[in-house]
Regions:
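Radical SAM enzyme [4Fe-4S]-AdoMet core and its adjacent flexible, acidic
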Residues: 1-123
Length: 123
């Protein structure tokens, strides 16, 4: 992906664009490291697509994400996280949805998002 970006960037005005949801917000600091100096628009927050809203993030997971965001000075993400209010029902829906997808794909969510393991296993 990075290689393709660099090829296109020589001829076009390109940038990375990503939505922000309850799972990927925890990977944005890694994404920032990976894309380096390249243009990146953090995108829009998922607000009406339950269960992927930020309200699915339990407080202990949110704390991990906030620490990462503070380290990188990602003020917009910090504000989104701080403004979100945890809703256990939404989190349970998210974990159930992820489990169904994992069954179909032969994947395991905690392999990519280990901070969610106790919630995934409990659901």
């Amino acid at each position: 992906i990075i290689e393709n970006y660099d090829k296109l960037d020589k001829h076009f005005d390109v940038s990375f664009m990503s939505t922000i949801n309850s799972l990927n917000i925890g990977k944005f600091t890694q994404l920032k490291k990976d894309i380096g100096h390249r243009k990146w628009n953090q995108g829009s927050v998922i607000v009406n697509n339950r269960p992927y809203t930020l309200s699915a993030i339990p407080d202990d997971v949110k704390e991990i994400y906030l620490n990462d965001c503070f380290e990188f000075g990602m003020i917009g993400l910090i504000n989104y996280l701080e403004d979100s209010v945890y809703d256990e029902k939404v989190m349970t829906e998210l974990m159930q949805h992820c489990k169904r997808r994992d069954t179909l794909r032969g994947t395991y969510l905690p392999d990519v998002f280990p901070e969610w393991k106790k919630y995934y296993e409990k659901t």
